[in-house]
Structure formats: structure tokens, C-alpha cells
Design a protein with these regions (language model features):
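Metal-ion/cofactor- or nucleotide/acyl-coenzyme-handling active-site neighborhoods
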Residues: 2-358
Length: 358
């Protein structure tokens, strides 16, 4: 027993010394970045993998577009009529795209399409500013140009061709000044304005309002389509836009409100066809509207990728800036894939690259 006790007294200091040296050694390695940290590498690897997958899918879609463009486009009348009939039977744009006194009576409730909240009751004051009837009527325009804001329009020389359309739809108050007119034209029949733009550019119309009115001059007396009833916060600023034009806007665009019921129907229509985005983009909404009210639908500026299809040169997100869109809300490449399918079927025509002089 005495021998064992003596042995333990000798071993204990040695064990403690070895442990101390081991800890000190590992601390030294860590501080000098000799030991890699697995946790710091995992996200990077995941991010690279995700980015690689995204690029791969984009390349597939670009290849599809180029394949379709290798053949001369021709309208397929039977396909067009079939798709238009199906779209009209589900969404009813002619009677429901815009909130009117006919489809939204006094005392009825407006249900927001973008959020679950208490319905908005149509008061006398709100009813009075609603359009008395649908602005599209029962007429069908022979040709419509839906102009997206994609960077592919830069240096396209498509302005003259766009202006030749009978009805021209533009998205989110894009600039039409002399810098861009050659590429995007200046004719406008309908232009949309998201509430976010009214907040960002015009302080939500809580301060000076005349700059907003002046900025609308390039659109002439086009329809100004406001999504006033998508979200609760969209309503006040959209109503301020309406009253601003009523107070200051002689010879300015005519403000009307996008119908949330139409948007719900349209979202369901596209989801049934495999589009699972949170909500459709303005471009897809306007392309869908055009398919119901026009005999021939042409899309310009619809290209959701950062390289040109012809020569892979880098292009900006918009023809006027390189600001990122809300990709978490919209699924632009997937939407484009659906539109590309309609192009291939001869239902709509997507224009990529430069336009030929007329």
C-alpha cells in the first residue's frame, strides 16, 4: 500500500503536466489558424453549391430560348384561342381586372389579396372614386405591346416597333425620356405604379405632391393602374395618388385600382400550371391581361438573366439601372419559362435582341 501511494504521488504531477502541455499546444495551433474550423466551411460550400445549381438552371433556360429563336416565330391561332378562352373563363379580366362600381357595390367588402386582414368596407367616399365601368369595354385591340423593364432592352432599337402597337402597357413608372426613347418608345396606354415606388420616390405623397404629377407627364392620358388593395399599407398611399391627380393632374393619367379578386383568380390560374411563386410579378399580370384584351400580344424587356442571349455579354437588371428585384416574392426565371412555352406554342411573341427597322 505504501508503494502504491508513493507511485500515485509521482504520477499525478506528471499527468497534470502532460494535460497542460496538450491544451497549450492546441491553443497555439488554433490561434495561428493551423486548425481549420469545419463550421466556417460548411455554409460556404452550401452557398457555392446553391449558386452553381442556380447558374445551371439559368443556362438551361437560356439554351431553351436560343433553341426557340432558331425557328421563325409564327402565331398559332388555334393555340391562342384555346389559351385565351381558358384564361378568360378563369380570370375574367374584362369584367374584373379593375375595381368598378359595378363589380364592387356600395357597402360590400374588399378582400385584400396579399394578406389576411379585416376586409375593407366600401364606404360612400370610396365608392365615389371607383371607376363607373371597366375601362377596357368589350373591344379587342388588334395588337398589344407589354413592355417589361429588363436590361435586354438597352441598345435594342425597339422603340419604333413598340410605338406601332395599338395598345402599349408599361410597368412601374419606367423612365421614357430621350435617353431611352429609341429603345423603349414613348407611347403608353396603361402604366402600373407599385406603392413602394410612391414611397421611395415621392415620400409616400406626404410632402410635396407636384413632382409626382410632373413625373407622369410622359404617359399622357394613359390608365394609371394602382394595386391599392393588395396589402393594407397599399391603400392610403394609393388613395393619396388618386386625390393628387384629381387636385393637380389635368391631362394626366387616369388612376384606377387593380382588383384583388382578379389577382386571386390569376394566382390560382398560374399555380394550377406549376408556377409556385408567392405572387405573380407585374410583368406576368400585365401579359395575362393583354392575352384577354388583345388579338396579338408582343412582350419586350422580358429577360430575367444577367447575360445577353446572343453573345453572353453582361446586361443590367433594368434598362435604366441595375437594382435587384424582389426575388423572394417573384420567381422571374420560372415565370419566363412559362411565357417561353407560350412563345413556342405561337400564343405570344417574346422579343429578344435588337428590333429590325420598319
Amino acid at each position: 500500500m505504501r508503494v502504491m501511494r508513493t507511485l500515485m504521488l509521482w504520477l499525478l504531477p506528471i499527468i497534470l503536466l502532460c494535460s497542460f502541455c496538450s491544451v497549450a499546444f492546441w491553443i497555439f495551433l488554433s490561434n495561428n489558424n493551423v486548425i481549420p474550423h469545419p463550421s466556417s466551411r460548411i455554409p460556404q460550400k452550401s452557398s457555392e453549391t446553391k449558386s452553381s445549381k442556380g447558374c445551371s438552371k439559368d443556362n438551361v433556360l437560356i439554351a431553351k430560348a436560343l433553341e426557340n429563336y432558331s425557328h421563325k416565330w409564327k402565331k398559332h391561332e388555334a393555340n391562342f384561342k384555346r389559351f385565351r378562352s381558358l384564361l378568360s373563363s378563369k380570370c375574367h379580366a374584362v369584367s374584373k381586372a379593375v375595381v368598378t362600381q359595378n363589380n364592387t357595390p356600395l357597402g360590400s367588402n374588399v378582400i385584400y389579396d396579399g394578406e389576411r386582414r379585416k376586409p375593407l368596407q366600401v364606404t360612400q367616399a370610396l365608392f365615389n372614386i371607383l371607376a363607373k365601368e371597366q375601362p377596357f369595354g368589350n373591344a379587342t385591340w388588334e395588337s398589344c405591346a407589354v413592355v417589361g423593364n429588363g436590361g435586354i432592352l438597352a441598345n435594342s432599337s425597339c422603340g419604333e416597333e413598340i410605338n406601332s402597337a395599338q395598345f402599349v402597357i408599361r410597368c412601374n413608372l419606367p423612365p421614357l425620356d430621350n435617353r431611352y426613347e429609341k429603345d423603349v418608345g414613348n407611347k403608353t396606354s396603361l402604366v402600373t405604379a407599385n406603392p413602394s415606388i410612391l414611397h421611395e420616390k415621392y415620400s409616400g405623397l406626404m410632402e410635396r405632391r407636384r413632382p409626382f404629377v410632373e413625373s407622369l407627364r410622359p404617359y399622357g392620358q394613359a390608365l394609371l393602374l394602382l394595386p391599392a388593395f393588395s396589402y393594407g399599407h397599399s391603400t392610403p398611399v394609393s388613395l393619396r395618388a388618386f386625390y393628387t391627380l384629381e387636385d393637380f393632374g389635368s391631362d394626366s393619367p387616369l388612376p384606377v385600382f387593380l382588383n384583388p379578386e382578379y389577382l386571386r383568380r390569376l394566382l390560382k390560374f398560374w399555380r394550377e400550371r406549376g408556377l409556385n411563386s408567392v405572387r405573380p410579378s407585374t410583368g406576368l399580370i400585365m401579359a395575362s391581361l393583354a392575352l384577354e384584351i388583345c388579338s396579338n400580344v408582343h412582350l419586350y424587356g422580358f429577360w430575367p438573366f444577367n447575360k445577353h442571349p446572343n453573345d453572353s455579354r453582361p446586361i443590367t437588371n433594368h434598362y435604366y439601372d441595375d437594382r435587384e428585384s424582389k426575388k423572394n416574392v417573384h420567381s422571374m426565371p420560372t415565370e419566363f419559362e412559362h411565357l417561353l412555352k407560350l412563345h413556342k406554342q405561337g400564343v405570344i411573341r417574346i422579343h429578344l435582341g435588337e428590333c429590325q427597322p420598319t
